[in-house]
């Protein structure tokens, strides 16, 4: 399902950027058909922006852009139900890759942007920074933390309400497996969960004492409603930003974002090839439209090289 609130936020910028693309000649004219995309709610704004921009050049290509979560997206992708899969983590070598192989789904991984998983609080929470250890203590599977003072006696005596992604989300996987490092690869379960980051934004913004986490994009769209916490991983408090994510300073919460493309669909279906080519050829503009963290020059060159190899 598309996010109408996101569409309202980016449409003016998309129209302006699309005009620039059209003036330069995007080469996306002529093809028609449908493209099925699903997966990460974090990557959704990026792929949706690509579709909005492509529509300005070729309205005959129609796309469905879903938000089933990274794991849910890979389940559909490896079953051959979708052409592209948005992911906020690499495909799992032990569980998901064998399913793709079993079903004859050959694919290409494209690194499309960088994200900073952002820990936010309701503005009424007088806390500015958490250590990685405090973040783990808050979200680990057996956590009993329910008051801010449980993390630090100097924090406010205020009850904590928690909001976070559901278990199908790559954002959840990243927090559970990479940040917390729990053997069970789970977090605590007593929180309000949603695969839609907009629901999490509304929950934290509307609940005193609340905190949650999601991709940087959704925080940047809602800075008037939320406060982002800096994270101290041992070298002082570092705020989430484009610069700190690209430089690697914002650890352990920065991460790469991917789009996986079904190679057969790319070769056999004109609409899929046109969409994918447009996506990569205009990646910098699309990232700007969706307000993601762009790839470094080296990363962008690697992605373009990988894309060129798909036509070989």
Predicted regions and their residues:
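Exported/periplasmic ABC-transporter solute-binding proteins
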Residues: 3, 25-71, 75-78, 82-94, ...
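Hydrophobic alpha-helical context, especially transmembrane and signal-peptide helices
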Residues: 14-16, 30
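Acidic/His-rich segments in extracytoplasmic proteins that coordinate ligands and/or metal ions
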Residues: 94-102
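Bacterial N-terminal signal peptides that target proteins for export
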Residues: 2-13
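C-terminal motif of bacterial Sec signal peptides marking the signal peptidase cleavage site
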Residues: 18-23
